[in-house]
Amino acid sequence: EGFIRRYINDLQTRGKYMVCCNDGTKKMNCPERRRDFRQPVSVTTIKDYDKVENIIWYKPQAYPYYANSRSYVLPYIGVDSYGNAWLRLVFHYTGDSWIFFKKITVSVDGQNYVKDFDYFEVSRDNGSGDVWEYVDISPSTTDINMLRAIAASKETIVRFQGDDYHYDLTVKSSDKSAIISVLDAYSLL
């Protein structure tokens, strides 16, 4: 809640908080809703500015800095210089053995969501004795609903499934909080 409150206060302070454009539509690029993209979304996010693409990426503080830190499922937000925002979603495995996952099953309190990937959709790398595999996607409405279910769940297990191996990740409560914070902030953009 503090994440959202600070974000709304940030927008209201500049007089740029509007629910819709004057013509009644909800657009990211109408002048009334455009916000200064260089201003922070929240102090609870990590801001990464891409000077070449002129995009700011906002990631929750729970987002690992190093690729081989831990496995996770987390969304993040991109905002361009025109104030247009979009959501991204990362499924990330790291460990000491390759999974070569092609499928992810997310079990949210017993309800399963399944995502299939082609071999080349998954990025893979290694270093310092660790391996990591991940996909970074534009989430569908179903994916966003799944993220909300994860955040509200008692237990969520994410299975990274390959042909011969799999890895089960239990989503931490800190990641659940990060998920809902990012989704709530995104819904205000």
Residue locations for each model-derived region?
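A generic "folded-domain core" signal
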Residues: 3-18, 25, 29-189
